């Protein structure tokens, strides 16, 4: 047996979510820690191959934007699919921005998504037997902050 012959990872896009958010709620800010903010998740659309639905209201994205522009985020929200199944999503990650874009991002200006790194690691909770498989796989998410919403693309790692 060759224990060095480990199966390589592959990934496949399973679905995407376009999320509509409200204005950030500022919790606090200083020059050492950064800016803590809560961003309400209002709604959104789920799209995929036989995986479509909507984002339920009531979610929140808790962020801390460090003085160097790095954003540490932790979002909690739920989706309801067209077949009636509900899935709770916990999505933790980071967004790092090159120095030349830090001030634009801090002020809320639009920055080309290809100019920065925005990745998350989502986990899922569901009571639907049809989607329990999601709880047993690792996913990664590529994200983009667009002028009107946030685009998340979810990839299953195999």
UniProtKB/Swiss-Prot annotation:
Pfam families: DUF3237. InterPro entries: UPF0311. Gene3D superfamilies: 2.40.160.20. PANTHER family: UPF0311 PROTEIN BLR7842 (PTHR37315:SF1). Belongs to the UPF0311 family. This is UPF0311 protein CA_C3321.
């Amino acid at each position: 047996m060759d224990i060095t012959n480990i199966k390589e990872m592959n990934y496949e896009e399973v679905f995407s979510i376009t999320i509509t958010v409200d204005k950030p709620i500022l919790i606090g800010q200083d020059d050492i820690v950064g800016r803590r903010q809560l961003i309400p998740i209002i709604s959104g659309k789920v799209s995929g191959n036989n995986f479509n639905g909507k984002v339920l209201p009531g979610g929140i994205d808790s962020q801390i934007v460090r003085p160097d522009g790095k954003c540490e985020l932790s979002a909690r929200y739920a989706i309801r699919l067209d077949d009636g199944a509900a899935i709770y999503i916990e999505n933790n990650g980071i967004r790092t921005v090159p120095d030349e874009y830090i001030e634009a991002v801090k002020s809320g200006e639009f920055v080309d998504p290809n100019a920065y790194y925005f990745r998350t690691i989502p986990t899922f909770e569901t009571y639907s037997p049809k989607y329990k498989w999601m709880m047993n796989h690792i996913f990664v998410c590529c994200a983009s902050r667009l002028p009107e919403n946030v685009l998340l693309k979810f990839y299953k790692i195999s």
